[in-house]
Amino acid sequence: MEALSAKNVTKRYTNHVALDNVTLTIPEKSIYGLLGPNGAGKTTLIRIVNQIINSDQGEVFIFGEKLNENHIGVIGYLPEERGLYKKLKVGEQLLYLAQLKGMSRSRATEQSKKWLKKFQIMDWWDKKVEDLSKGMAQKIQFISTVMHEPKLIILDEPFSGFDPVNAQLITQEILSLRDNGSTIIFSTHRMETVEDLCDHIALINKSKKIIDGPKKQVKDQYKSNTFIVEHKGNHLQLPLERYQIVRQETHEDNHFVTTIKANNDIKANQVIRELIDKTELTSFREKIPSMADIFISLVKGEDDEALRKHLQEVV
């Protein structure tokens, strides 16, 4: 089942189209990266899903049902602009926000304490939010997002303000939430997060969806039949009608690292067979474009051919 489906969603303002006929589907129990530069339309889509604003055209479905007010309790939303009440104590804050999502006070108390204990911060219960560091407040905001056990969790730059240790802690909790049945939507600029966590992605740029799909499928779409070869002996000599030497590095002890691009009709096993006859092969791998490569190139507006050339040159 699809956790979220947006169909032909458009949002216009007086002098600006924030979303232009965007359609995408987010599989249930996936970690979905919603990517794009600032002002692309990501936050507008998130606000529509959270019923903060309405679309001008199109429809949104949550687990097969048209978006309605009953979905408020199904969604957990961590906005980029954090919104805790600074004068409230941590415990009061968590209870208040959980009850807004439909939890009873007793259940909210139970869940709040469970998460504070999990993060080993139970002694923060009576601290005012204004007395917390940015990283500490981030933990409380994260807890408030997930403590009502939402089936759909939307995280807008969730690692902002965290040191590496706490970022890893939050990462582990996100994976655990996914494994326990939640669907996670990431809106992020951190491509390492996309590489490590996301199994599906969509890229929005200038209000339009540019690409979407399983991460591996997107990467495969932009492969350029380029291979990185480590070998000993001599510089590679390959038939120019079938291969292009993109880069060749010389290391100690006659060790070389050569990047080659093969014609599109040549398979990896054919390349290996040809190399074995010409050199002492020590390592062979296909060059897979990173999400950062794909993101930067598409946002720059390069066409497919220029993008493929760029990806073959970047090692």
Regions found by a protein language model. Name each.
Residues 82, 243-244, 279:
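Structural motif
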Residues 263-315:
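C-terminal coupling/interaction segments
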Residues 2-6, 11-205, 211:
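ABC transporter nucleotide-binding domains
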Residues 85, 192, 235, 266, ...:
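Short alpha-helical
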